[in-house]
């Protein structure tokens, strides 16, 4: 990521003429994002239009404005919609970036937030049985202690027993440790129970604030 795309370019008085890659704020924030596993294409948050989801956006904005205490309390959030492409993942990442903005100062090299596409996470976990990926092993080791984890698209498919065991172990451990999680999916509780099973769906749904989006697919029509 080039410094010209810095997260603070619209509010920092040094941007663009006096800013450079040695800026401490930029370096700390970049390190947090690089360690988070957020896809680089999503490092800069979209400006989202609420449409019919105004009330849902206001709920999420309230969490965003209090994100540091929200994470410290070990809260959980499930953002879902029957429709695709209406901002669920974008909002989850927006909240994580807001948290990074609150904790960057003096953070050093500590990993504070992690993003996982659940289907990819499960595929890579299964591949570990035959091919040890040291980078992914390290990511998995940090899951339990990390402040905030995004579990994106958690309800995408019915879990096998193997995949169910993996997810349940990690999510159960985080909830018991009072660690914050953000889940996204495309099903309500009934669909979640079908895909995740009763035990895991109970952990996710009953321990989370549930926010539903109803707008249609808006990919390509966001303002920014």
Predicted regions mapped to residue ranges:
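Short glycine-rich substrate-engagement loop in P-loop NTPases that contacts/grips substrate
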Residues: 54-61, 80-82, 86, 99-145, ...
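Walker A/P-loop nucleotide-binding motif
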Residues: 71-93
């Amino acid at each position: 990521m080039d410094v010209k795309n810095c997260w603070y370019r619209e509010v920092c008085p040094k941007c663009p003429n006096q800013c450079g890659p040695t800026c401490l704020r930029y370096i700390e924030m970049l390190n947090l994002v690089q360690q988070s596993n957020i896809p680089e294409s999503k490092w800069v948050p979209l400006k989202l239009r609420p449409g019919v989801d105004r009330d849902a956006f206001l709920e999420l904005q309230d969490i965003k404005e209090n994100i540091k205490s929200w994470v410290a309390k070990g809260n959980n959030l499930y953002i879902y919609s029957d429709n695709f492409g209406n901002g669920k993942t974008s909002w989850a990442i927006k909240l994580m970036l807001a948290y990074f903005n609150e904790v960057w100062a003096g953070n050093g090299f500590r990993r504070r937030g992690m993003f996982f596409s659940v289907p990819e996470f499960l595929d890579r976990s299964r591949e570990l049985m035959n091919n040890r990926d040291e980078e992914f092993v390290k990511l998995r080791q940090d899951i339990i202690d990390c402040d905030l984890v995004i579990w994106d698209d958690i309800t995408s498919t019915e879990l096998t027993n193997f995949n169910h065991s993996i997810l349940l172990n990690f999510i159960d451990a985080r909830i018991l440790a009072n660690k914050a999680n953000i889940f996204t999916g495309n099903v309500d509780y009934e669909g979640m129970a079908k895909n995740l099973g009763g035990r895991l769906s109970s952990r996710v749904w009953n321990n989370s604030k549930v926010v539903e989006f109803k707008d249609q697919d808006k990919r390509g029509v966001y303002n920014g």
